[in-house]
């Protein structure tokens, strides 16, 4: 926008022309206006909202963080909308969260809140929570000390910390697929080379490792129990095989074990249980058993790694919320967490069986699936040729049913992730019948 001439401005504001000249010089110095010789003086475009938006869009292209794929962005945007049926959602429904236990733990925390330190944390986490995690890990065959445990703001936060504080740039990450990690871009941010190891061919992981044997900067990322999204688990023999190969070739293992407490039959050991040389970095979280909003997870690793991560963390966020850590500690200390788990496993198994019964009645001729012995999910793979993207958008736009298509997890199959953890049985039944109707239609 062009501004009036100096003479016009002097007349308009009834001031001396010298005042106008000095004002223009000052505004030019601040960058608000600019002068074109022989043309006049103009207001800078950056004050225009449309221009600002375009500039931000340009600058964001330089960001080291990639945006999620469009389907993931859409899912993230809609999955908090209660008007939709969320048949794939990876969290507990409200009725399954331990509301009474949380209230009691919060009350106990509040009763001695004056004893808490509300200053900046040291990056390692609340000592009492770390100690009680050590105690619980010991009962599961993992013998570590407080110095081997660091509290994080969830499992994904732990992986992000490892990405920037442990793995070098241009590292090679060999991970099982399909996996939720593919929907996060967490390994793509630092130019990591992401190599897929299909979960149903996990025994061939040695061959994949051999292809990169001369690369020093590499790591394995494994979900050993109740993989998200397939619900599959590794056998003890497979876990031992991975450990043996890891030790032989000096390859660290990142073990993502977030569903460790949600099992419907005898629990199997973590990969960390077989670790004798400290090659396994074990990650878990309370997000799947208490609530995502609690934002508390942990890392178990060698003392040197924990020390490094704690130092890096002090450069980022100074640690997780002390209040959330205290609440989780109270639930663990008074055993209410374990009582909650007993009930949770029973209810989730019942909901899983309810979903499987409907699948057997409707989908057995057009799809196949595995029966998971824990976690939240049933992985539905269609036998027929179907456009999963079309199914996703049709259900979303016409039925307000949100499904998570398999391709966001790196799957090449015609697949979707189903969850029995979030919705009521009534909504599960309704959603599955609608999915069946649309699949038969297309």
Curated annotation (Swiss-Prot):
Family annotation (Pfam families): Aminotran_1_2 (PF00155), GntR (PF00392)
Keywords from the UniProt entry: Activator, Aminotransferase, DNA-binding, Pyridoxal phosphate, Repressor, Transcription, Transcription regulation, Transferase
GO function terms (MF aspect): DNA binding; DNA-binding transcription factor activity; pyridoxal phosphate binding; transaminase activity
Modified residues (N6-(pyridoxal phosphate)lysine): 288
HTH gntR-type domain span: 2-46
Keyword Transcription on entry: yes
InterPro entries attached to this UniProt entry: Aminotransferase_I/II_large, Class-I_PLP-dep_aminotransf, PyrdxlP-dep_Trfase, PyrdxlP-dep_Trfase_major, PyrdxlP-dep_Trfase_small, Tscrpt_reg_HTH_GntR, WH-like_DNA-bd_sf, WH_DNA-bd_sf
Residues annotated to bind DNA: 6-25
Transferase is among the record's keywords: yes
GO biological process: alpha-amino acid metabolic process; biosynthetic process
Cofactor: pyridoxal 5'-phosphate
UniProt similarity note: In the C-terminal section; belongs to the class-I pyridoxal-phosphate-dependent aminotransferase family.
Role according to the record: Positively regulates the expression of the NorB efflux pump and negatively regulates the expression of the AbcA efflux pump. Binds specifically to the promoters of norA, norB and norC and abcA genes. Could also have an aminotransferase activity.
Name of the protein in question: HTH-type transcriptional regulator NorG
Source organism: Staphylococcus aureus (strain bovine RF122 / ET3-1)
